[in-house]
Design a protein with these regions (language model features):
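Nuclease catalytic cores that cleave nucleic-acid phosphodiester bonds
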Residues: 2-146
Length: 146
């Protein structure tokens, strides 16, 4: 088991790395050349800048039972097809049961934006979201390290 972090725009990198250290789990950070992260306790993979370049690097690197942290539904779908675990920065676990609905919602939102509509962005991040993420990550590591 490894923890792979889609670090571009990810607010929980430090929380994930703390859990990886505590559980003695190998950690990898993926970012493009515009967002280089160098963190102790993790191997950083820097990919060329480009649409979804970090996502494809993760999809090619992920193995069965890895944990991937991302907010990208497309990447989550690819990760699930590799029998890995995938959660977002709020601690929501992507599953075979919910990914199709999430991808459809993303498609619908894109159609609204392309038609000139506006979709409200997320509210400011809270400490409760950090706690929820941390608890979920610990729960997943304990579930699969038994």
């Amino acid at each position: 088991m490894r923890i792979l972090i889609d670090a571009d725009g990810c607010p929980v990198v430090d929380i994930a790395l703390k859990t990886a250290r505590e559980k003695n789990i190998e950690a990898h950070i993926f970012c493009d050349t515009c967002h280089v992260f160098e963190k102790d306790g993790a191997e950083t993979h820097v990919v060329p800048k480009g649409a979804d370049s970090a996502d494809f690097a993760i999809a090619n690197f992920v193995k069965c039972r890895d944990i991937v942290i991302t907010q990208d539904y497309g990447l989550a779908s690819m990760v699930l097809s590799r029998d890995a675990i995938c959660i977002n920065q709020d601690g929501c676990e992507y599953t075979e049961e919910n990914i199709d609905g999430l991808l459809f919602a993303r498609h619908t939102a894109k159609k609204v934006r392309n038609a000139g509509g506006r979709i409200k962005g997320p509210p400011k991040r809270t400490k409760e979201q950090d706690v929820r993420f941390s608890e979920k990550l610990v729960e997943i590591t304990e579930r699969f390290c038994k």
